[in-house]
Design a protein with these regions (language model features):
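Thiol/disulfide oxidoreductase modules built on the thioredoxin-like
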Residues: 114-121, 129-169
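Short pre-active-site segment immediately N-terminal to redox-active cysteine/selenocysteine motifs
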Residues: 64-67, 72-75, 141
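Conserved segment of the thioredoxin-like fold in thiol-based oxidoreductases
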Residues: 81, 91-130, 142
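Conserved redox-active cysteine motifs that mediate thiol-disulfide chemistry
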Residues: 71-88
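Hydrophobic beta-strand core positions in alpha/beta domains
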Residues: 70, 102, 146-147
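N-terminal targeting signals for export/organelle localization
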Residues: 1-45, 49, 156, 167-169
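A short beta-strand-turn-helix
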Residues: 45-67
Length: 169
C-alpha cells in the first residue's frame, strides 16, 4: 500500500511539472524573462497584480526583508497541504521578519480569490496570468519555494519548504 501511495505521489509531481513545462506554457519576451532568475544569485525582477488589481513589484521588498516566493496553483494538492505551514510563518516567530508572496500560475483572479478565501490563506497572492514569472524562474513543478535574502540573493530554491527557514534569514 505504501508503494502504491508513493507511486501516485510521484506521478502527480511529474504531471504538475509536465503541465508547467509544456510548450504552450512558454512565453517569448516580457520583463521578467529578461532578468536573471533560476541558476543565478540574483532573483528575476517582476511586477504582478494582486487579487485587488494593485501592481506589486519584487523590488519594493529587496534590501528591506527576506522574501519567500511560493509558486503554486489552486489545483495542486501539495500546494494546498503546505498552506497551514506557510500561514504559521505569518504569525509565529518569523512574523515581520519575512515577506511571503504567493504566485499563482495562470489561473483567473476569480478562481484564485475563491481558493484564498476558502483555504484561509493569510499572505499576499499575486497572479502570474501569462506565466512570465514562472518562466523567468524556470519553474517546472509546483509547489516551488524561492527564498531571496535581504541582500537580494537567491538563498533557497526547492519543491519543499526548508525545515528551518530561520537559518537562512
Amino acid at each position: 500500500m505504501l508503494r502504491y501511495r508513493f507511486a501516485i505521489a510521484a506521478l502527480l509531481f511529474l504531471l504538475c511539472g509536465a503541465a508547467l513545462a509544456g510548450p504552450e506554457r512558454l512565453i517569448s519576451g516580457g520583463d521578467a524573462a529578461a532578468t536573471p532568475g533560476a541558476g543565478s544569485d540574483r532573483p528575476a525582477e517582476f511586477t504582478l497584480p494582486d487579487l485587488d488589481g494593485r501592481q506589486v513589484a519584487l523590488g519594493r521588498f529587496l534590501g528591506k526583508e527576506p522574501v519567500l516566493l511560493v509558486f503554486w496553483a489552486t489545483w495542486c494538492p501539495e500546494c494546498k497541504a503546505a498552506i497551514p505551514e506557510i500561514n504559521a510563518m505569518t504569525t509565529g516567530p518569523l512574523a515581520g521578519k519575512l515577506q511571503i508572496l504567493g504566485i499563482d500560475f495562470r489561473e483567473s483572479r476569480e478562481k484564485v480569490a475563491r481558493a484564498v478565501t476558502s483555504r484561509g490563506i493569510r499572505y499576499p497572492v499575486l497572479l502570474d496570468l501569462q506565466g512570465q514569472v514562472a518562466r523567468a524562474y524556470e519553474i517546472v513543478g509546483i509547489p516551488t519555494y524561492v527564498l531571496i535574502g535581504r541582500e537580494g540573493k537567491v538563498l533557497y530554491r526547492e519543491h519543499v519548504l526548508p525545515g528551518d527557514i530561520s537559518r537562512y534569514l
